[in-house]
Amino acid sequence: MSESFSFTGGAVLTPDGVFETADVHIADGRIVDAPSRDGPRIDCRGRVVLPAIVDVHGDAFELEIHPRPGVDLPLDIAMGAVDRQLVTNGIATAFHGLTISWEPGARGIEAGRTFMDALPALRPSLTADHRVQLRWETFTHDAIHDIAGWLRLDPTPAIAFNDHTTLGLADLRSGNARKLDRWAQRAGVSLDDYVACLEAAGEQSGDVAGRIGEVAAMAARHDAVMLSHDEQTASERRASREIGMRVCEFPLAREVAAEAVAAGEHVVMGAPNVIRGGSHTGAMSAEDAVRDGLCTVLASDYHYPSLLHAAERLVARGVGPLAATWTLVSANPAASMGLDDRGAIEPCRRADIIVLDCSGPWRLVHTVAGGVLTTLGRRLSS
């Protein structure tokens, strides 16, 4: 169903952050003031009507494209499966974290080119709004020409400035072969070949700062949202801010998040961190950060269902009421990405809406993405 319909009698989260019993009308992909003459009316009494989820960083799509090292599936099949995962988890807008790295294989430049070339043609067949966050590994200078072209696309991708190379070199020096071996398996090469690529990338360290400035200037010219990544100190956050990185993604220390929040910037942390009770890498707790006002956005990271489950867990544990908690997965992510046409339920906004039954364990009943209605009616734990 993608034309005109109404949700009636539900508890609707208003832009003011309160719930009101109201009807919500959808036509031609937008929220409108009045119902259409012939559109169906869907009874939502006893249910909660919320703006759909906006995911600013998710890389679970990689496993659909590359389910095993060296195994690639057709992009149309893989992204169709990703689309269904998004919709069945209440996500109407997804920024796919596309790593652009010196690594061979799934995260290499050529794989990035293939994805970016294919996505525009796939979009019309997909229900959710599929966008891209370019996860540029800052030692990958061969990709800068490609990035310049991608920044001209519509919609403009976001860009995150990642440095896992320095970490990899540190692991190499310390003899931590386990992590490097895992990365080599992901790239589909031997450990020796991976180390050779890593060391070759490391030889460009003297040029990295200048290249970061170059790419940041390009991104600014195209009004692309820029994100920092894995910052460890407040001084790093300030330096990132100076060149235009206004979103702080996955800070590794409280002082970084506090610096960002004090400057009015959004801080992104992983929803899996919430549902697991902590970070899988030993970084700061997302639940504690939310409780302390140091996290404003949750992202799926590597697991799409975590966004709904994290919101449910935070409400159940008394971290915040539903209205306030929901801003972490809808209004704030939309704002952080500069998407002022979604993240709230009001006329003229894009019709991205979910309907939840919260009478017991949360049950997602309907997802609307760009006016397209999907009826689900399943429990989140199923």
Q: Could you tell me what each predicted segment is?
A:
Residues 153-157, 240-247, 262-268, 293-296:
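Glycine-enriched alpha-helix->loop->beta-strand junction motifs that scaffold or abut catalytic
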Residues 52-56, 94-96, 130-134, 157-163, ...:
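Hydrophobic faces of well-ordered beta-strands that scaffold small-molecule active sites
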Residues 101-231:
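Metal-coordinating catalytic core of metallo-dependent amide/deamination hydrolases
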Residues 44-115:
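Metal-associated gating/positioning segment near the N- to mid-region
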Residues 263-273, 277-358:
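His/Asp/Glu-enriched, well-ordered alpha-helical/loop segment
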Residues 10, 24, 29, 46, ...:
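Divalent metal-coordination and catalytic microenvironments
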Residues 1-38:
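N-terminal metal-binding scaffold of metallo-dependent hydrolase/deaminase domains
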Residues 10, 28, 329-331, 335, ...:
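C-terminal cap of metal-dependent C-N hydrolases
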